[in-house]
Amino acid sequence: MTNHHQSTRGEPRVALVTCTALPDLDPDDRLALAPLAARGIAAEAVVWDDPAVDWAGYDLVVLRSPWDYALRRDEFVAWARTVPTLVNPADVVAWNTDKRYLAELSAAGVPTVPTTWVEPGADWRPPAETGEYVIKPAVSVGSLDTGRYDLADPEHRELAAAHVRRLSAAGRITMVQPYLRAVDTDGETALLFLAGPDGLAFSHAICKGPMLTGPDQGVAELYREERIDARAATPEQLDTAEKTLAVVPGGTDRLLYARVDLIPGPDGAPVLVELELTEPSLFVGYADGAPDRLAEAVATHLARRS
């Protein structure tokens, strides 16, 4: 990690924002430290809710692994609004940390997983169909508070209803989605985009294996281990990702990074699971040159602000 005094040599200072559980960043993000230093950029990990931090002392504040925000979203968004050099910007964070953004993207023509939104206090009963469904809160990180239920199983039907009641009692909006079985064979494809001289540009893609094996177990870890492999994006996936990014409020030129998570729909065509603009793992360790491209994206944003 770089010391504060290095900035006196005129190096731009960059905060890489994390949480108390990962004070030295996620290992994948650490891969960008050497490329940043090689560009004369003094970067250091900083915990987002550390009251001692002077955010104005940084030339750029880059969200990376503040993965404890889901149960404190209002506090997190309020903090983001106090950091003028934040990327991605605070209004993007406010929009993207509530998954109801998916309804907006769907209305704009982006293919998404069909979703039922259950407001707190609403009376929800499992649908009559007997397929598998995923239940999760609209504000969540990773697979926390997320479960997969087979509605042909009476016990699962009751567990699903209890899951929704539990989230509702906590004042949380719930998402109910059909489980798309192609995930079991194809996994989820994440397409990573990083800022370049001409705006956001495709960098690389990875495949995430399925993680949801059954009902919500109340797992308390910050994030579950995933099986990750490098993957080449298909033209159809790239097209869907670009269509998704084209309808982001405020445009994509001000974004430093974006991750578009796709799975095959019932007809095999890609559908959007999530658009990650807040704190996505960027998986730079899975693609040649990706740590350098991330450092270059930071340098691009610094140059715009100088």
Predicted regions and their residues:
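Active-site nucleotide/adenylate-binding loops and adjacent lid/helix of ATP-dependent enzymes
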Residues: T2-T18, A80-P84, A90-D186, P235-L238, ...
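Phosphate-binding site of ATP-dependent enzymes
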Residues: H156-G250, V271
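ATP-dependent carboxylate activation and anion-phosphoryl transfer catalytic cores
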Residues: P235-S306
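Anionic group-transfer/hydrolysis microenvironments
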Residues: P66, A138, Y179-L180, L192, ...
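A short beta-strand motif that forms the metal-chelation/ATP-contact edge
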Residues: Y58-L63, K136, T189-F193, G268-S281
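Short, solvent-exposed loop/turn segments at secondary-structure boundaries
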Residues: P27, G147-Y149, G285-D288
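Conserved N-proximal alpha/beta basic substrate-recognition cap immediately N-terminal to
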Residues: R13, C19-E119
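A short, glycine/Asx- and small/polar-enriched loop/turn
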Residues: D54-D59, A128-T130, P264-V271
